[in-house]
């Protein structure tokens, strides 16, 4: 279990700080399978998970939904045949918060 995956998300308000460039560089190394995307000027974490069929992709999606509810932090999820695209960002600050990296690490653990 990674250090990030052991952490809990904290409440993120609109005035919470986004991760700094230095924090981003440190945190992204802890989740090497994730990439950083910028959409509409908003930095986001994204990963595509591959599965053998739609049913397995859907099972993963449902596990992720349960995790998101437990942590009160919710991703963008696109479930397709054989793959699930997961995108994490903090809506309230329109960017990346430490919570997003925690949730990315926790998402990876759903495969175990």
UniProtKB/Swiss-Prot annotation:
Record has Lyase as a keyword: yes
Pfam families xrefs: Pterin_4a
Keyword Lyase listed: yes
EC id: 4.2.1.96
Catalytic activity: (4aS,6R)-4a-hydroxy-L-erythro-5,6,7,8-tetrahydrobiopterin = (6R)-L-erythro-6,7-dihydrobiopterin + H2O
Molecular function in Gene Ontology: 4-alpha-hydroxytetrahydrobiopterin dehydratase activity
Domain of life: Bacteria
InterPro entries documented for this protein: PCD_sf, Pterin-4-alpha-carb_dehyd, Pterin_deHydtase
GO biological process: tetrahydrobiopterin biosynthetic process
Keyword set, alphabetical order: Lyase
Family from the record: Belongs to the pterin-4-alpha-carbinolamine dehydratase family.
PANTHER family: PTERIN-4-ALPHA-CARBINOLAMINE DEHYDRATASE-RELATED (PTHR42805:SF1)
NCBIfam families for this protein: PRK00823.1-1
Protein name: Putative pterin-4-alpha-carbinolamine dehydratase
